[in-house]
Swiss-Prot record:
Gene Ontology biological process terms, A to Z: proteolysis
Family according to the record: Belongs to the peptidase M20A family.
Signal among keywords: yes
Protein name: Probable carboxypeptidase BDCG_03757
Localization per record: Secreted
């Protein structure tokens, strides 16, 4: 948002329409599909195809259940039941609802492991919450000749991240059939979409031992079936401006908070394009430029009233450096743009900020990808400083961020089935570590 657009938006006193607590994720390119087309009747029974597949039917079951953040208990119960029926010991890790939500749902993380193996060395983890609104599960046949792999599954959570949840479970079960004592655990957390409350709760619990009993973590998010070598850091902050209200016919009797905040926001908006030596935020060869998004702007009471207050919320995707360094750069930029005005206040309310996250990619057979969106990975503190074996972290999953959170969220049967193969490959590599 450049200054001319920003000024127009502010003068019209508009507020960007965003769901509270959620950040829009960045776009990746779509993946490719294998060619397995065969002629088939146009009235192919899509529901029967799903019912005949353990993977697809599990995916359908959990996607048909609404599980917007802070309302995950029903899908949690479905997973507890399913895993218990398939030789897993399951535990509920109760997680209080987020402070800014009035939900009364008694939701929880799901922790599961093979019977008799409460400390698995390999953990597969993803999240069971979704962004709002819930969109019903639906199946769509491919155009032209029928190809089972190109059946499209749509609905909220079909990609982000219940596709990962279902594929992880089936991959784990496949390994347990071959080797009942395979040391694999499953962790499905709540509120990833609202700041990672579920993963933070697990991280702070007695299950997160020091040193860790696990040596491999496999995280599930939509990555187009590619192995992610890292993602940008995350930082949020708010800017507030104070003014004095007055009749717009006599503006000299007041002081416009919007006029105070405009130059500050203009400066903030360009920090990702300014070299560090000139006061901008850092870039890197791996992650590109640091990006900023002025997500909400609020101010004023009416067009004929000098506004006494204005505010903006900003999300930053860090490409390099530390959170503390970025905060210092932002503080100086705001002070310079405002001339040190006492009417401008800068707040960093998010104690969940983190720098760029580098991940492991030492398993052959995957294309690599770097992403801009955030995950639960930095929310899990790993206490391996004094351990001879360092914990490896992988990020992989079916589907693309291109459609996650949107009205057309969905993926193909082929992508979902390939994800089981991908997770199995990662499990195999982890088993070889011992």
């Amino acid at each position: 948002m450049k200054l001319s657009h920003l000024a127009a938006a502010l003068s019209a006193q508009l507020v960007a329409p965003v769901a509270a607590g959620y950040l829009r994720q960045d776009i990746l390119t779509a993946g490719t599909l294998r060619d397995t087309t065969v002629p088939a009747a146009p009235n192919e029974d899509l529901n029967q195809i799903v019912s005949d597949s353990q993977l697809l039917s599990l995916h359908r079951t959990i996607c048909e259940i609404e599980s917007v953040s802070n309302h995950e208990s029903t899908v949690g119960e479905a997973l507890i039941k399913y895993l218990g029926e398939h030789d897993f010991t399951t535990e509920k890790q109760i997680v209080p609802v987020d402070e800014d939500d009035d939900s009364t749902d008694e939701r929880y993380n799901v922790w599961a492991y093979p019977k008799g193996s409460p400390k698995p060395k390999i953990i597969l983890t993803s999240h069971i919450d979704t962004v709002p609104p819930h969109i019903n599960y639906s199946l769509h046949a491919p155009e032209g000749d029928f190809d089972r792999a190109n059946i499209t599954i749509k609905g909220r959570g079909t990609v982000d991240a219940k596709a990962s949840v279902a594929a992880m479970i089936i991959a784990a079960l496949d390994h347990m059939k071959e080797s009942p004592d395979v040391p694999v655990g499953l962790l499905f957390v709540v509120s990833e979409e609202r700041g990672g409350t579920g993963m933070i709760h697990f991280s702070d619990s007695e299950l997160n031992t020091s040193p860790p009993f696990f040596h491999t973590l496999i995280f599930g998010e939509p990555t187009e079936l590619k192995l992610v070598d890292g993602h940008k850091g995350n930082l949020r902050f708010d800017v507030e401006a104070k003014g004095v209200s007055a009749h717009s016919g006599y503006p000299w009797l007041g002081h416009s908070a919007i006029s105070e905040i405009l130059p500050v926001l203009a400066r903030i908006d360009g920090l990702g394009d300014i070299p560090v030596e000139d006061g901008g935020l850092p870039s890197s060869e791996k992650y590109g430029s640091t990006t900023l998004n002025i997500g909400t702007v609020r101010g004023g009471a009416a067009g004929n009233v000098v506004p006494e207050s204005a505010s903006a919320s900003v999300a930053v995707r860090l490409a390099d450096g530390t959170v503390e360094d970025a905060q210092d750069i932002i503080r100086k930029a705001v002070a310079d743009a405002s001339g040190g005005s006492k009417n401008i206040t800068l707040k960093f309310p998010d104690d969940k900020a983190y720098p760029p996250i580098d991940l492991d990619t030492d398993v052959d057979g995957f294309e690599l990808l770097t992403v801009n969106y955030g995950t639960d990975i930095p929310k899990l503190d790993i206490h391996d400083e004094d351990s001879d074996v360092k914990v490896k972290r992988y990020l992989y999953g079916p589907g693309t961020i291109l459609v996650a959170h949107g009205v057309d969220e969905g993926l193909t049967v082929g992508d979902l089935e390939k994800a089981v193969e991908g997770y199995s490959k990662l499990i195999d590599a982890a088993v070889k570590r011992g």
